C-alpha cells in the first residue's frame, strides 16, 4: 500500500488590517531623471494629494543612480531603491513587487507609474487578492497596465511642477 503525503496548501491570507504599499517610479512622475531636490519635493507633494497618502503606508521610491541623492533629499522617509541602466528604476521596483512577498504582507498596492513593464506584476498581485491601484500622469499610462489594475487614477503632470497645488 502506498501513501502519499498531501502537499501543504497555502495558508489563508491573515488579516492584514489594511496594510498599504505605495510604490513610486519617481522618474515616471517627473518625466525623467530627478536632477533637483525641488523635483522630488514636487513629486512628493503631488503624489501625497493624488494617492491620498496619510503617513501610515509603506512607501518605496525607485530611481536611477542619477537621481538618488535628489530623490532622497527631496522626499525623506520612504525606502529608496536604486538601479542604474536602462529601466533601472523600474527594475528595482519590480524586484520589490515580485521578490518581497508583497501579496502576503499588504492588502493594497498603489503603483505610481504608467510604465507597461509593471503590467504582469500588477496582474499577478491582483490575482493573489491584492487590491491594486495605478496612479499615473495623464496620457502616460500604458493600456496593459490600466487593464491589469483594479483602478486607475490619472493626474496632471503640472501638479508636480507646482508642488501639488491644484
Indicate where each model-derived feature is located:
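Nuclease catalytic cores that cleave nucleic-acid phosphodiester bonds
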Residues: 65-166
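Domain-level signal for Mg2+-assisted phosphodiester chemistry and nucleotide/NA-binding surfaces
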Residues: 1-92, 131
Amino acid at each position: 500500500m502506498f501513501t502519499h503525503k498531501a502537499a501543504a496548501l497555502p495558508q489563508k491570507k491573515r488579516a492584514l488590517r489594511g496594510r498599504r504599499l505605495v510604490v513610486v517610479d519617481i522618474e515616471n512622475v517627473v518625466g525623467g531623471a530627478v536632477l533637483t531636490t525641488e523635483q522630488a519635493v514636487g513629486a512628493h507633494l503631488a503624489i501625497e494629494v493624488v494617492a491620498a497618502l496619510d503617513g501610515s503606508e509603506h512607501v518605496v521610491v525607485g530611481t536611477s543612480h542619477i537621481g538618488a541623492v535628489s530623490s532622497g533629499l527631496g522626499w525623506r522617509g520612504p525606502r529608496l531603491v536604486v538601479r542604474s541602466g536602462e529601466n533601472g528604476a523600474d527594475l528595482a521596483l519590480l524586484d520589490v513587487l515580485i521578490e518581497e512577498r508583497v501579496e502576503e504582507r499588504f492588502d493594497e498596492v498603489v503603483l505610481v507609474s504608467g510604465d507597461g513593464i509593471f503590467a504582469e506584476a500588477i496582474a499577478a498581485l491582483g490575482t493573489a487578492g491584492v487590491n491594486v491601484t495605478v496612479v499615473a500622469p495623464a496620457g502616460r499610462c500604458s493600456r496593459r497596465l490600466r487593464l491589469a489594475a483594479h483602478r486607475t487614477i490619472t493626474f496632471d503632470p503640472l501638479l508636480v511642477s507646482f508642488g501639488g497645488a491644484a
